[in-house]
Amino acid sequence: MLTTTCRRLSQALQRPHALSAVAQRCLRAPGARSYADQNEKAEQPRTFHPALLQFLVCPLSKKPLRYDASTNELINDELGIAYPIIDGVPNMIPQAARTTRQKEKQEETKQH
């Protein structure tokens, strides 16, 4: 099972433009940092790669998540929580998640 998952992840990341700056840096020798790496940080913000959604699940419900590009969050509609994505890396710590249902409840009360 782990082999299959690793193979699928590898295939997803090998698609054109799939390797982000973070992934490319991870593939280099550990500890090797260059001046070019520092310039990359200033030039391009890191973005989340949607191909990773097939491997990510909510740590609380173990259900799939959906990516909302407008808020840059991974959302669990069932529980009404959203995990932030910071520099292209999802913060999947439950304490870091925000609730989304409060907004829905406020909108419903305003309509009535």
UniProtKB/Swiss-Prot annotation:
Span of domain TRM112: 49-95
Location in the cell: Mitochondrion
Main location: mitochondrion
Any one GO cellular component localisation term in the record: endoplasmic reticulum membrane
Superkingdom, taxonomy of origin: Eukaryota
Presequence extent in this chain: 1-34
Gene Ontology biological process terms, A to Z: protein stabilization
Disulfide links within the chain: none
Keyword Mitochondrion set for record: yes
Pfam family, any one: Trm112p
Keywords: Mitochondrion, Transit peptide
Subunit relationships: Interacts (via TRM112 domain) with NDUFAF5; the interaction is direct and stabilizes NDUFAF5 protein. Interacts with COQ5; the interaction is direct, stabilizes COQ5 protein and associates PYURF with COQ enzyme complex.
Protein family membership: Belongs to the PREY family.
Function comment: In mitochondria, S-adenosylmethionine-dependent methyltransferase chaperone that supports both coenzyme Q biosynthesis, by stabilizing its components, such as COQ5, and NADH:ubiquinone oxidoreductase complex (complex I, MT-ND1) assembly, by stabilizing complex I assembly factors, such as NDUFAF5.
Protein name in UniProt: Protein preY, mitochondrial
Species the sequence originates in: Rattus norvegicus
